Structures are given as C-alpha cells and as structure tokens.
Amino acid sequence: MSNVSQPRAPRCALVVLGVSALTSLLAVPAFAGQVNLSGLDSQPTLERFIVKYKDGSSAAVSPTSMRASLNSVASTMPARAGRALGLNHVRRTALGSEVLKTDRGLDRAEAETLMRRIAADPSVDYVEVDQIMYPVLTPNDTRLSEQWGLGTSSSSINVRPAWDTATGTGVVVAVIDTGITSHPDLNANVLPGYDFISDATRARDNNGRDSNPADQGDWTTAGQCGSGSSASNSSWHGTHVAGTIAAVTNNSTGVAGTAFNARIVPIRALGACGGSTSDIVDAIVWASGGAVSGVPANANPAEVINMSLGGSGSCSSSYQNAINSAVSRGTTVVVAAGNSNANVANFTPASCANVISVASITSAGARSSFSNFGSTIDISGPGSAILSTLNSGTTTPGSASYASYNGTSMAAPHVAGVVALVQSVASRPLTPAAVETLLKNTARPLPGACSAGCGAGIVNAAGAVSQTP
C-alpha cells in the first residue's frame, strides 16, 4: 500500500514502508498524547507498553524526568492486595520510543486506564500496547511431492520463464521470523543475522539479544501463553519461509527457492509465545540498514524484508514509523495478510501503509479459506499446502527435513522472492513504490473465486521480470 517513493542508494553500496491514520485512536485531553487501544484485546493480561515522548520534552531527554513522570502515573493506579503498581522503564527502541513494563499483569480495563493516564502528560506523543505478534501459518501434516506455487499452472507465480534471466543474484532478503535452522538446502544462501528477542525466557537462549539467529524452538506447554492456551510443537517457521524465498536449487536435493541465488539474512524476533512489537520494530530498522543501540551494524542491508507474522488491531505508530524508516532506505516490505478469514484492516502490520500486503490462494487459484482479505490487500500468492525446508525436532532442533504448511505466511515469501528477482535485473534498484506498482501491473487474474478482495491478482514473476526497467 505504497504512498511514498524514496530514492535508493546505488546497489554497489550494498553487499548484497506517510504515516497512516490510526482508526482506533480515541479522544484524550487537549494537548495530550494519542492512545492506540487496538492491542488491548490481544492478550488476556498486559504488562508491556510503548510510549513515545515528544522530541525536546524533558521526559525525552532526561531519564530522571521520565522516571518522575512514570512514578507519578503509577501512584494514581489502584493498589492490588495492598501493593502499589510498579511501572518500570525497560529500554529505548531504535526510533526513540520507550518500552515500559508493569510489575504485574493488568486486565483490559486497568491497562486502558494506565495508558490514558500516561497520555495525559502533555509531553507524550503516543502510547500503545507492546503487542505480541505470532507466526501466520496453519500447520499441515501432509507432505506434497511438488511445489505447485512454482509450477506452470495458472495458479502458480509463473516463475520458471523468469529463471532464464533472473535468479536473485546480488539481492539480500531479510526474514524477520523465528530464526533459522541449519539445512543443507538453505545453508549456502544464508548470511549472518541477529537475534532481536530481548526476553531471555521467550528466546530460550538465556541471554536475550545476541548475534546468533538460530531458531531455538518455539514449542509451548499448555497454559504457557495464557490461560487456556494449548501445547504446541516447534514450528521452525522461519526455516520454512526462508526456503520458499531462497532454497538452494539445481543441487539434486529437496526443493527450489523462488529467488534461489538471493541471500537470506535471518532475524530472530519470534520465540516461545510469539514476539513483542518493540523487538520486531527494532528488527525492521536493523534489517534495512538503520542503527539500533547496542546492536552492531548490519553488514548486509536488505533490499526486501519478509514478515510472515502479525496480530490483531490496526497499524500502530511503532510499526508505521519503523516501516517508513525502512522504506526511506529503499527497502521493500512484504507482509502476510493474516489467517483470520477477516478484513485485513484489523490485522497488523499488514494494515500499515507502505507495505505489500499478501493474501493466500489455493492451487485452484481461489482465496484460501483462512486468508484475510479486503480493499488494502495488494497482491496474492500461493499459501495452501506449500512444501519447503523444515526441521524434524518437536521441541529443540533435530535433523533437516521438508514439510507442507498452510498460511499467508507461505504466500508472502513467494512475493518477497519475486521482488528479489526484479531487483536482481533492475538497471538500478527500484524504489519500494515502483516495485509495488510493477507487481500490481503485471499480476495475473485469479482463476478461482475471491469476492472479498485479493488485490491485483496472483504475483507474476515472469511478467514482472520482463517489465523491469
């Protein structure tokens, strides 16, 4: 949904998403900050929030002033069991907002009260929930013998003719996901990445952020992710997504990648029970070549970011600012539309401006029953029964394997791969807005039904490559 076009540095400088209105913003006192309530229903209890203080305000420049402001707000909140609420500063994000954490979980009403009281400070620009995002897939135990999405049917992405002239050479795709596992059909195309999970428990490596993006497993036990949550095996979601983009090809092994000569920068932001918005937005900035405090510079800035993740609610300021930051550096941001069979306007970050929002279709060319839809879907890609690289471990990593998954998580990397193909043959790197326009103008009609909005059609690799300037 591009609405800006930004210049891009020449490719030789590389080794290798305007702010939308927030429909859930509600009125607050005059001169106070905006309150985005869209994340309040995302979790049964809430304890992490993101606050952006206005540039130049005392709270923005003085930790002591910010601490005094937070203590003042906390003192107005009702005590529980005789204990006052604690409100602590965790860290500053790459774009200058502050991550806050309460010392106990709050219900929806308590969290809304806290957010409104924080926003009543005239120095606050906005406040929102540090929402948890999740991989956007529906696992399928059936393994297919072929990759229909890369085939020759009218429902495929029509990639085989494109491979005669474009294979993704020289293009870096950042995959913000669960990390990656070692796989003989992937390893040769993987560059150094980073682990952005700041919560050591969620990360399972006991040390928070570090330079190792290896997927430690995202298995959960019953109740671990909230009351009533079920147990689940590790998904190895990032490995599956990466394989669809750039699995090694012509090696007489396994599967093919859409852009099989592109390189993957794996960025770990999802762990046990998902991943926090504050970690993901830092990952977006870093992936595109921006600076993140305490994290070494990314030696391989991405021309494409794939985010097969999301959660409920409209686009938050944190997401939009991070996406705009990436787009300003020339990085195209591809996002899964979500698997709720609902309007994408209520799913984030797919509802953000300046992203390519991707719906899922079946091998018959119809909208997948689970796929989100709507007027802001940009394009569709194969997302039902998609075979790709995986791992056999049910909890911690086991041996390399292959499996079929369903989800808009699987559709998005097909599109990200096509973007890599396009950039690899462009005479100079295309702006994100130009990439989106090219994909829409060359898309093929869906041969099946989608009455609710599936964008311009099925992404058409050969058509896009042939019309790349």
Task: Give the residues covered by each predicted segment.
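Bacterial N-terminal signal peptides
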Residues: 16-25
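Primarily auto-inhibitory N-terminal propeptides
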Residues: 28-148, 163
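Protease zymogen maturation seam
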Residues: 35, 91-95, 115-172, 180-189, ...
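Flexible, small-residue-rich helix->loop connector segments that border functional cores
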Residues: 158, 162, 176-186, 215-261, ...
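Peri-catalytic substrate-binding/gating loops that frame the active-site cleft of hydrolases
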Residues: 178-231, 260-273, 345, 391-406, ...
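Hydrolase catalytic cores
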Residues: 242-246, 258, 265-273, 305, ...
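C-terminal subdomain of the subtilisin-like protease fold in secreted/lumenal serine endopeptidases
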Residues: 266, 286-289, 294-309, 315-318, ...
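Active-site-adjacent substrate-recognition loops and nearby beta-strands
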Residues: 280, 314, 335-355, 359-377, ...
